């Protein structure tokens, strides 16, 4: 999948925040301002975005796990959809403190959710009173909302992709503590410091968010497909050298 500058323009990637809210550390990525709004330099954004996608592709080819993080209203739905399409974990509700740094505790909640799902599947609700069944459903819904997207993650991810680094400071800090690379969309009002793969761009427009997220999901699927293709070709190539001994 290749993204063009025209597509970025159409999605409004270049629109930053109001000039009075700017972070001076984003100066290298700002083209200018119009109507008191900073304009992001897409000639900087495009190669940086493509570089991030290259990294994602390589990570996916090596069977790496990338955790998608986006809990703002305009990013929630598309982020969950695209992460699921790419077969990756995601956080689309609130980021719970310790989700990475205290993953052992999170695993207990994941086990509880999976046990509840299995119990429901087995018809456990039928033997409960109305009140018990209601309490059960409520707890399960709450767990699904907070950790449903990471229930199959298994362990600490190899990288995290964050749609709005300012809004998800805790996630970025936890990743940094554990040495997990961060791919992050950074708008003009936030700092790019501590982000391994910076994508300077609009983090509020749902169109822009959809562009970033779809691109990352596509890169993951491409990386995996390339890895499978290489295995197939290696196996085919090996056929020429197989000597069958008779008798």
Curated annotation (Swiss-Prot):
Instruction: Provide the coiled-coil residue spans.
Output: none
Q: Which domain of life is it from?
A: Bacteria
Sorted alphabetically, which InterPro entries does this protein's record hold? Answer: Ribosomal_uS2, Ribosomal_uS2_bac/mit/plastid, Ribosomal_uS2_CS, Ribosomal_uS2_flav_dom_sf
Give the GO biological process terms.
Answer: translation
Tell me which Pfam families the record gives: Ribosomal_S2
Q: Which GO terms describe its cellular component?
A: cytosolic small ribosomal subunit
GO molecular function list: structural constituent of ribosome
Its keywords, alphabetically, are: Ribonucleoprotein, Ribosomal protein
**Presence of keyword Ribosomal protein:** yes
Q: Does the keyword Ribonucleoprotein apply?
A: yes
Q: Which family does it belong to?
A: Belongs to the universal ribosomal protein uS2 family.
Q: Which HAMAP family does this chain map to?
A: Ribosomal_uS2_B
**Which PANTHER family does UniProt cross-reference here?**
30S RIBOSOMAL PROTEIN S2 PROKARYOTIC AND ORGANELLAR, SMALL RIBOSOMAL SUBUNIT PROTEIN US2M
The name this protein carries in UniProt is Small ribosomal subunit protein uS2
What organism is the protein native to?
Ralstonia nicotianae (strain ATCC BAA-1114 / GMI1000)
Q: What is the lineage of its organism?
A: Bacteria, Pseudomonadati, Pseudomonadota, Betaproteobacteria, Burkholderiales
Q: Which gene encodes it?
A: rpsB
């Amino acid at each position: 999948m290749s993204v063009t500058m025209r597509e970025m323009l159409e999605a409004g990637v270049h629109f930053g925040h109001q000039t009075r809210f700017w972070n001076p550390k984003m100066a290298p990525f700002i083209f200018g301002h119009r109507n008191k709004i900073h304009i992001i330099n897409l000639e900087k954004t495009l190669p940086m975005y493509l570089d991030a996608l290259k990294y994602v592709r390589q990570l996916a080819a090596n069977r790496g796990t990338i955790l998608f993080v986006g809990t703002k209203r305009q990013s929630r739905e598309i982020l969950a959809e695209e992460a699921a399409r790419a077969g990756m974990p995601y956080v689309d509700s609130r980021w719970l403190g310790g989700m990475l740094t205290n993953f052992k505790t999170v695993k207990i909640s994941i086990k509880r959710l999976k046990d509840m799902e299995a119990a429901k599947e087995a018809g456990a609700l039928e033997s409960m009173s109305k009140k018990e069944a209601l309490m059960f459903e409520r707890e399960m819904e709450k767990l699904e909302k907070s950790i449903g997207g990471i229930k199959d993650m298994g362990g600490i991810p190899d990288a995290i992709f964050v749609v709005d680094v300012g809004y998800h400071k805790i996630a970025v800090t936890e990743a940094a503590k554990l040495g997990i690379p961060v791919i992050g969309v950074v708008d003009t009002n936030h700092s790019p410091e501590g982000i391994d793969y910076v994508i300077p761009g609009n983090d509020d427009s749902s169109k822009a968010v959809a562009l970033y997220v779809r691109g990352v999901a596509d890169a993951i699927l491409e990386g995996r497909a390339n890895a499978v293709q290489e295995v197939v070709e290696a196996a085919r190539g090996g056929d020429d050298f197989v000597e069958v001994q008779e008798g």
